[in-house]
C-alpha cells in the first residue's frame, strides 16, 4: 500500500503547487441490494453483515489521505436494502444531492437503479457479473468495476489452454444464472480453441444442501452422475447458484481437475493475495474490520478508489466530467494486481487481471503469457470492442 499512497501524495502536491487547494466535498452513496438467497454450502463462506461496506470504509481512508492535501473531503453514505425498496433508497440519496453511486447487487437491480438515477448521475457496478450489462443492456451512466462472466470464463480458458487441457466436460446448473455462466464458457472455448466434449445439467431439486447432501450421499451420487463421460482433460463447473459445484472435486467418476465455480476459481481478489503490495492492504483491512477481505469488499473499495483518483486528477465531483476522465486515456489506477487498471471506452468495463484461486493460494493470474492483443493483453478477457453491441458508449 505504501507505494500507491506515495504516488497519490505526489499527485496531490503537484496539484497544490499548480494553483492551491479548493474545498470540495465528494459525496458517494453505496447501495447494497440484498436478495433472499440460500446459505452457502460451506459455513466458512457465510456473508458478513458489512459485506462490501467494509471495503468502502478502507477506501474512505485511502481517499482521505490525498483529499486532505487538496481540500477534498469524502462522505460515503451506505444503505442495505431489499429489491423492493432499492429505488426508494436511491431517491432519498438523490434528494440529498448525491450524484455518485456504487451499487452492489444483481444485474436487474443495477439496471433499475441506473435507469432511475438518469443521466445526471454516475453509477459504478461493484457486484453484477452479467455480461449483458456490458453488451446490449449497457447504460451510459453505468461503469463496471466487477468483472463480467465473460472475463471470468476467459481467465479460466487461458489457463486451461496454457496447460493444454483442451477437452472440457461442462457441468451446469438448472437456474438461469447457471445457464448464463455456461454460455460464457462455451464462448470462451470457441475463442481460445478448446472443445466441449460433453455437457450435463445438474438439476436443483431443493432440500438442504448442508444436511440432505452430506458427504456420504455426495460420495455416492456424484460419481454416478458423472459416469460415462467422454474423454476429457478438465471439468468446468457452471454453478452461479452454489448448488453443486463444491461437491465435484475428488468425487468425479474420472479423476480430473475442476475449474470454474469450484476447484480453481477465477476471482477479482481474495484474502491470500500478498503480491504487488497486497499484504499491506490485507493487514489494513483486517485491522479495520476484524475479518478477511471478500471479493465484494475489494470491488467496493476499488470503485470508491476509482472515484477518488478521478476527483484528485480533475478537481471536480461532477459526474459527467468524472466519467469522461475515467474513460479517457489518462486514467489509470494501482489496484494491487501487478499492473494499472483502466476502463474500456466501448462499454465501461474496467480492465483488470483476474486471479485463479484454489481456496488457499494464487495458482495463476490471467491474462496468461502469450495471449496477445493489439491494445492490451487485458483485453483478451471479456467482450472486445467488435463483440460488444453496447450502443450507449458510441
PLM segments and residue spans:
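Extracytosolic ligand-binding ectodomains
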Residues: 4, 8-10, 22-394
Amino acid at each position: 500500500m505504501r507505494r500507491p499512497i506515495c504516488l497519490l501524495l505526489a499527485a496531490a502536491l503537484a496539484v497544490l503547487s499548480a494553483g492551491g487547494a479548493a474545498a470540495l466535498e465528494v459525496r458517494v452513496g453505496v447501495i447494497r441490494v440484498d436478495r433472499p438467497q440460500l446459505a452457502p454450502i460451506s459455513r466458512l463462506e457465510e456473508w458478513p453483515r458489512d459485506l462490501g461496506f467494509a471495503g468502502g470504509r478502507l477506501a474512505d481512508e485511502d481517499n482521505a489521505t490525498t483529499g486532505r492535501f487538496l481540500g477534498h473531503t469524502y462522505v460515503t453514505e451506505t444503505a442495505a436494502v431489499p429489491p423492493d425498496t432499492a429505488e426508494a433508497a436511491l431517491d432519498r440519496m438523490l434528494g440529498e444531492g448525491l450524484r455518485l453511486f456504487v451499487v452492489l447487487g444483481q444485474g436487474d437491480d443495477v439496471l433499475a437503479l441506473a435507469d432511475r438515477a438518469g443521466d445526471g448521475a454516475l453509477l459504478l457496478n461493484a457486484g453484477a457479473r452479467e455480461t449483458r450489462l456490458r453488451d446490449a443492456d449497457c447504460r451510459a451512466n453505468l461503469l463496471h468495476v466487477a468483472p463480467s462472466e465473460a472475463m471470468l470464463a476467459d481467465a479460466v480458458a487461458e489457463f486451461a489452454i496454457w496447460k493444454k487441457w483442451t477437452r472440457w466436460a461442462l457441468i451446469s446448473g438448472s437456474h438461469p444464472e447457471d445457464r448464463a455462466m455456461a454460455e460464457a464458457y462455451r464462448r470462451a472455448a470457441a475463442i481460445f480453441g478448446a472443445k466441449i466434449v460433453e455437457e450435463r445439467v445438474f438439476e436443483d431439486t431443493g432440500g438442504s444442501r448442508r444436511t440432505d447432501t452430506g458427504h456420504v450421499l455426495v460420495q455416492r451420487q456424484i460419481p454416478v452422475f458423472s459416469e460415462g463421460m467422454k474423454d476429457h482433460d478438465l471439468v468446468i463447473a457452471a454453478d452461479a447458484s452454489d448448488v453443486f459445484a463444491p461437491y465435484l472435486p475428488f468425487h468425479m467418476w474420472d479423476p480430473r481437475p475442476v475449474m470454474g465455480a469450484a476447484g480453481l476459481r477465477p476471482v477479482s481478489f481474495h484474502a491470500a493475495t500478498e503480491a504487488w503490495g497486497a499484504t499491506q492492504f490485507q493487514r489494513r483491512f483486517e485491522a479495520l474490520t476484524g475479518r478477511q477481505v471478500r471479493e465484494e469488499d475489494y470491488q467496493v473499495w476499488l470503485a470508491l478508489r476509482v472515484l477518488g483518483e478521478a476527483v484528485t486528477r480533475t478537481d471536480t465531483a461532477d459526474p459527467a466530467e468524472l466519467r469522461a476522465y475515467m474513460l479517457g486515456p489518462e486514467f489509470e489506477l494501482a489496484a494491487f494486481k501487478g499492473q494499472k487498471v483502466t476502463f474500456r471506452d466501448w462499454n465501461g468495463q474496467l480492465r483488470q487481471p483476474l486471479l485463479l484461486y484454489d481456496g488457499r493460494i494464487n495458482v495463476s493470474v490471467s491474462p496468461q503469457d502469450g495471449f496477445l492483443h493489439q491494445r492490451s493483453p487485458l483485453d483478451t478477457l471479456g467482450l472486445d470492442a467488435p463483440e460488444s453491441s453496447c450502443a450507449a458508449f458510441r
